[in-house]
Amino acid sequence: MIYVVMGRETIPDVSAAIGFTASFLPTAERRTIYALVQAVSGAVRFCIDGTTPTATKGVRLTEDSTMEVWGAEAMRDFLCIENIVQSDPTVEVIYFGRGGLA
């Protein structure tokens, strides 16, 4: 399988729980398969099960670490928040979908 970049975004303010921008999420027309996520300038906490993360609840993604979020449901349910109040991290996201012939 070959994956191609479908889009990218920077989430600049994670002081409150926030998810991916809806226009990047999978639809019948937009075949996004997964999102590559990086915490920049600080750690964040995230949930992909529909619960809301807090500064002390959720899976911790350390500064400059990356992780992948696979599948439409997990991408819709993804929420993240800064791990330490006023640490001002940002989140970089690259969205991938199917492409090419393999």
Give the location of each predicted region:
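A short "linker-to-beta-strand initiation" element
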Residues: 1-10, 100-102
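Low-complexity intrinsically disordered segments
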Residues: 91-101
